[in-house]
Swiss-Prot record:
Quaternary state and interactors: Homotetramer.
Organism per entry: Lentilactobacillus hilgardii (strain ATCC 8290 / DSM 20176 / CCUG 30140 / JCM 1155 / KCTC 3500 / NBRC 15886 / NCIMB 8040 / NRRL B-1843 / 9)
Family per similarity comment: Belongs to the FMN-dependent alpha-hydroxy acid dehydrogenase family.
Protein name in UniProt: L-lactate oxidase
Transmembrane segments: none
Active-site residue numbers: H264
Length: 369
């Protein structure tokens, strides 16, 4: 255990015997300090949308298929021209040093071990270059919270390009911080600095809450901003935080190379729909023009299957990976991915689907309780 400014950072490095991801969360709560756990696990206001992200997966059911001669399903896929061994990826999540002393560096190692993709956050505990290097050549994206300071944006985009990342994720649903009651109750302020802010900003984020940090980000974002980012970098730009078909088409029209359906894990607009409930409509509007990425609420292999069958090309997981990081470092991250991949393989076989392409063509039953 390492103590920084009174905050205890875990140093665990071990494989995990994962039963399910809900149990993993309970285990992580025991070892992550209260303020850090509240920041990681919490949603906005009374967390209605956070809960809806889980309930939404009950709105569709997978049709079992038995007489299909299927065995040994294959998880390999290719998105943005990037070959991947799993359709799962690690979402951009801030300040992973709250869970483990090595933070994003260990997350990158764990994701690389399963042949997956990781997305770095602007507000990472470790630098773009260090995180990319620790991934041993595995593909990574970099997520940008667009700053009011264009020089800051350019510096991050330039470093991301030098570090070899494969795409830029532009977050557009965080022009103001959601009202996060857990952070208020815990009077939570980041106890450790954010490496990219340390390097390129006058303030490293240490000793501040997320609302104060967001205050330096752009308070309004439009399609012209998407175009500006897309014109500046030659990397594909994926627009994150899309929940309406209209916004998806605006983003594509402005130069987006990908659409990322997400409600920020229920941390922003409380009272909005679950991301899974809007995924199919957004994917239909996109109509194959660009890849569709999805996150929010994934906890089971069946959730992954349903997301892929509803139009997602890549499926993101966030909090469970951070819990795995806290409990086991890089090996813990690897354990979380392997558990979900295993569940997905079982579901694929029972649903008569051999490949991820088969899953994407699978029909789901629409049922509302």
């Amino acid at each position: 255990m390492v103590v920084v400014n009174g905050y205890k950072q875990n140093e665990n490095e071990k494989k995990l015997n994962v039963l399910n991801l809900d149990q993993l969360e309970k285990q992580a709560k025991e070892i992550i300090p209260t303020g850090g756990f509240g920041y990681i696990s919490g949603g906005s206001e009374d967390e209605w949308t956070l809960r809806e992200n889980r309930r939404a997966f009950t709105h569709k059911q997978i049709v079992p298929r038995a007489l299909t001669n299927i065995e040994k399903p294959e998880l390999e896929t290719n998105v943005f021209g990037i070959p991947l061994k799993t359709p799962l990826f690690m979402v951009p999540a801030a300040a992973q040093g709250l869970a483990h002393v090595k933070g994003e560096v260990d997350t990158a190692k764990g994701v690389a071990a399963v042949g997956g993709l990781m997305a770095q956050s602007t507000y990472s505990s470790t630098s773009i270059a260090d995180t990319a290097a620790s991934g041993t050549g595995a593909p990574q994206f970099f997520q940008l919270y667009m700053s009011k300071d264009w020089d800051f944006n350019e510096a991050l985009l330039d470093e991301a390009k030098r570090a070899g990342v494969k795409g830029i994720i532009l977050t557009v649903d965080a022009t103001v911080d959601g009202y996060r009651e857990a952070d208020i109750i815990n009077n939570f302020q980041f106890p450790i600095p954010m490496a990219n802010l340390t390097k390129y900003s006058e303030d490293d984020g240490q000793g501040k809450g997320i609302a104060e940090i967001y205050a330096s980000a752009a308070q309004k974002i439009g399609s012209d901003d998407v175009a500006r980012i897309a014109n500046y970098t030659d990397l594909p730009v994926i627009v994150k935080g899309i929940e309406s078909p209209e916004d998806a088409l605006y983003a594509i029209g402005a130069g987006a190379s990908g659409i990322y359906v997400s409600n920020h894990g229920g941390r922003q607009l409380n009272g909005g729909p679950a991301s899974f409930d809007v995924l199919e409509d957004v994917a239909k509007a996109v109509n194959g023009k660009v890849p569709v990425i999805f996150d929010s609420g994934i906890r089971r292999g069946s959730d992954v299957f349903k997301a892929l069958a509803s139009g997602a090309d890549l499926v993101g997981i966030g909090r469970p990976v951070i819990y795995g990081l806290a409990l086991g470092g890089a090996q813990g991250v690897q354990s979380v991915f392997e558990h979900l991949d295993h569940e997905l393989e079982i579901i694929m076989q029972l649903a008569g689907t051999k490949t991820i392409s088969d899953v994407k063509n699978a029909k789901l039953l629409n049922i509302r309780y």
